[in-house]
């Protein structure tokens, strides 16, 4: 832009330079991703390659069909208009290209962009919700202790205070050991302490209702990972997020369905402004379409 200002508007080519300057001003706000580069970045050429076209540019996503087959298939079907929705008001069945025209309704800059919320879709959520497809052992959660050697709580659990620790860790442990009353605490103290020191993150998440599988691999959530949002175990619908940074504290609780292979710059642009999911924001980025291109 500074270079452009050096040109005099008295040139006969004034219109050209003004148009070029306008292009340079606007172009940083859009991102351009390349199909050839996207294909080259794929881990497996047989995986589905999706093109997400947004108001900020293109994002190419390699879906990991071998790691989350059911959830990947549902995502493709939603994108391609293969899932039926019954509208009680219209008394009719529709098969919309679900994501077309939706927005990234939740944005936490430098952390995550989230889209596909059924709360913002006139037809709501597809039924049924799908089960998680997560291999906690592949993630190493069976080897991560809840308590470190100095007695501090594993930071990936994001436990904020003693009350939360009691609710999330101690109460389910008591139930597993059959401790139901205060009077039973003292006789069971040794068992409680032993089990507490041996408690893993995987086991704690199982207390919370997560069920893990070992018949396929699972990768952790890192920058560029595409995973399904949920409101609890085995509650996977259409809503998804793209991680803008490594986020290992999310591992084991969200089913990973893909990875961005081209267009992370676009994702960063979308993530440049915080968006509150509780209210519509006309400045939020639009998903024009999501299509399989291979």
Task: Please place each PLM-identified region on the residue numbering.
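Bacterial N-terminal signal peptides
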Residues: 15-27
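Short, low-structural-confidence N-terminal segments
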Residues: 5, 16-17, 31-33
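N-terminal secretory signal peptides that target proteins for export/translocation
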Residues: 1-12
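Cyclophilin-like peptidyl-prolyl cis-trans isomerases
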Residues: 30-294
């Amino acid at each position: 832009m500074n270079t452009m200002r050096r040109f005099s508007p008295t040139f006969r080519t004034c219109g050209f330079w003004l148009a070029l300057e306008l292009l340079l001003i606007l172009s940083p706000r859009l991102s351009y991703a390349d199909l050839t580069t996207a294909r080259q970045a794929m881990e497996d050429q047989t995986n589905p390659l999706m093109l997400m076209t947004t108001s900020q540019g293109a994002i190419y996503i390699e879906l990991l069909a071998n790691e989350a087959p059911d959830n990947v298939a549902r995502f493709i079907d939603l994108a391609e208009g293969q899932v039926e929705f019954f509208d009680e008001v219209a008394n009719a069945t529709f098969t919309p290209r679900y994501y077309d025209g939706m927005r990234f309704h939740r944005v936490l800059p430098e952390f995550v962009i989230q889209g596909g919320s059924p709360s913002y879709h006139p037809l709501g959520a597809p039924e049924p919700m799908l089960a998680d497809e997560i291999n906690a052992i592949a993630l190493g959660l069976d080897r991560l202790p809840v308590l470190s050697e100095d007695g501090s709580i594993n930071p990936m659990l994001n436990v904020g205070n003693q009350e939360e620790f009691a609710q999330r860790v101690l109460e389910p442990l008591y139930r597993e050991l059959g401790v139901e009353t205060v009077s039973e605490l003292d006789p069971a103290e040794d068992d409680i302490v032993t089990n507490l020191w041996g408690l893993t993150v995987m086991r704690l998440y199982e207390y919370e209702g997560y069920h893990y599988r070992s018949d396929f691999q699972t990768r952790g959530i890192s920058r560029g990972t595409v995973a399904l949002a949920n409101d609890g175990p085995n509650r996977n619908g259409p809503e998804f997020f793209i991680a803008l940074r490594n986020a290992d504290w999310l591992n084991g609780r969200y089913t990973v369905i893909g990875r961005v292979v081209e267009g992370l710059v676009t994702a960063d642009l979308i993530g440049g402004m915080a968006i509150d999911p509780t209210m519509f924001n006309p400045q939020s980025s639009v998903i024009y379409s999501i299509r399989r291109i291979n």
